Amino acid sequence: MAAPLETVMTPCQRFDGRNGASATPKSLAFSIERIMAKTSEPKAAAFQPSQGLDPGAKKMLNLCSPLPCMIPIQSLAYDVHSKALLNYSELWKSSLRGSVCSPSGLCKSNCGICCKNDLNMGHTVLPGSRVIKPQVINQTVGLPTNGSLYYFNYLDSSFHPPEILSGQLLSSSLINAQSQATLSAQQKLFLLENAKLSGLAPEKFPNPQYPHKERLPGQLDQVMKENSALSADRSGKIHSKLGANSAEGKPKIFTCEVCGKVFNAHYNLTRHMPVHTGARPFVCKVCGKGFRQASTLCRHKIIHTQEKPHKCNQCGKAFNRSSTLNTHIRIHAGYKPFVCEFCGKGFHQKGNYKNHKLTHSGEKQYKCTICNKAFHQIYNLTFHMHTHNDKKPFTCGTCGKGFCRNFDLKKHVRKLHDNVSSSCSLKEISRTGQS
């Protein structure tokens, strides 16, 4: 790149048509060494927009005049593609949502968008503007062979000269050509998108020379969709997730007609209805037990596998699931996080806490159709129905008494047979000691 640059940036020579001799070369405003050196950039002059600027005319600048734009000279050896060649969606979204760059020109972090952290902070910046480092674009279509480098100045402000809005070049050009260079579609889009940072719509672009929606319909349509969505998000017009389903932004409420319980989705109400209907469509093929939900049946199947990989380190008791082990550990720790607000009784499990609260409410909505006995929960009514059907699947091995629930059987053994077995064992020990 150095060799072609030297041919372009040769000292200015003025050709005198009268005598055919070249005049004495003037001193350059800046030298090649100054451009190539990695030093602090010079201060830029303030950009004064002209009132009567013709959009169709492109101002060509030669190297013998100072640059009238507010960008510093970018070192040609610097890799600007890592910072300047950004995806438009990232660049535009950062500007709309509010980037980390302050309006005063002090960049709090090297954000990679405005690159102010690498610039000299002494530059004159327009009020409400944001200086982006000049972008070097390799242009190969429709350009002369003596150079292919352009410097662009993008101003993220409310004022954009027509040259940017029409997709033409602004600031300095290193090509000594009188015909306007043709930009590629991608580079036009890059120019137009940077102009959109100020919130201009495509229909506000004054020059109809570049029908962007015909050239790049998919990209620009996506840009406008993101523009409208993010603008609405910034102004607070987008509803929350709960309010997105309704026109007024209020969450939909599905109420159970039997118990009055409220749900935020119809699916949850459908899952709740088998509680009142008593339907248990998911039946275990091993024991025949029915469940209202398929997930409960899957958890139940672990019981029949006889696998208990989760063991308690203190008592050695094993469990099918880790959640059951965690609840069991609360017993050893004496931790009862669920406390009744009426009587102050604590519970290890939340289910036992809820069942206990029903005793204080006095509501027994589940009644037996045979004896009219009422219960707090439906599973108590289910076990009560076994008394009328004479079904007692749980039998005591000592006395042969039958029970409807395994819990009642364990309670029976603990109260009656555990004391008897312990007294019998003490008598046998005393007899062996006397003999």
From Swiss-Prot:
PROSITE patterns: ZINC_FINGER_C2H2_1, ZINC_FINGER_C2H2_2. A motif (Engrailed homology 1 repressor) lies at residues 27-42. One of its GO terms (molecular function) is DNA binding. Its main location: nucleus. It is found in: Nucleus. SMART domains: ZnF_C2H2 (SM00355). Pfam families: zf-C2H2 (PF00096), zf-C2H2_6 (PF13912). Keywords: Developmental protein, Differentiation, DNA-binding, Metal-binding, Neurogenesis, Nucleus, Repeat, Repressor, Transcription, Transcription regulation, Zinc, Zinc-finger. Belongs to the krueppel C2H2-type zinc-finger protein family. Transcription repressor. Component of the regulatory cascade that controls the development of dopaminergic (DA) and serotonergic (5HT) neurons. This is Fez family zinc finger protein 2. It comes from Xenopus tropicalis (Western clawed frog). The gene is fezf2.
